[in-house]
Amino acid sequence: MYNIQDHVVIITGSSSGIGLAASTLALASGAKVFGIDISNSPTSVTANPNYTFFAADLSHPESAKKAIAACIAAYGNRIDGLLNIAGVMDLNQSADTVTDDMWDRCIAINLTAPVKLMREVIPIMRLRGKGSIVNVGSKASMSGAVSGIAYTASKHGLVGATKNVAWRFKHEGIRCNIVCPGGVAATGIRDGVDSTQFDSEALEMMSVIHQAHASDHAKGLGLQPEDLAHSLLYFLSDLSKGISGAVIPVDNAWSTI
């Protein structure tokens, strides 16, 4: 399906939502997938001999280093692709209400962990003279009107990190892009979020933006994790050769407002 036969691909957030859909599609395309998640290994892919699972809390400082060491132990000193999908939401907390814990967790998982994983895989990709990294952003990567300050800052930061990596390693065969989904059903990103704790005033301010996109689902036009998986695999593969440093909305035109 995609030209990634026998490629070693690391996928974070692999146990649910977009991460699981991407893992399933990558395996179907012949890749060897190293899945990372804080949740249990997904039963739908665990039995596949080309799937290796590593349990990790990406907010821990050493998790990226340990994960890549485990990947090398499983598949050797080869990493062709990295999909940084794992992420956490905030509670729409504003600059005047955000807690230290919420800020620290969003930055740690949504920004610091992807950067640390890139730091670990890029030297391996440089040795091979080739590699592809796809980070997953959000509508909040390009707007200040859809989420809280912690999530928004983390996703804006990931855009900057993506562009920096793309330019720095453009002559070494390493590409880096960021796909920004919006309005995807059942992503798992809200798991563990207590909806009763949302900043109601901030949520009300942003409701007009949310409602504009919610109409897609009512009309049967909402995106599913599998839709995002195809976009991610396209940009991971050589089908998108020459595309690097790009910020790609996959949100059925939500990014136009």
UniProtKB/Swiss-Prot annotation:
The lineage of its organism: Eukaryota, Fungi, Dikarya, Ascomycota, Pezizomycotina. It catalyses: protoaustinoid A + A = protoaustinoid B + AH2. It comes from the Eukaryota. It comes from Penicillium brasilianum. SUPFAM superfamilies: NAD(P)-binding Rossmann-fold domains. This is Short chain dehydrogenase prhI. The chain crosses the membrane at residues 7-29. Keywords: Glycoprotein, Membrane, NADP, Oxidoreductase, Transmembrane, Transmembrane helix. Belongs to the short-chain dehydrogenases/reductases (SDR) family. It is a single-pass membrane protein.
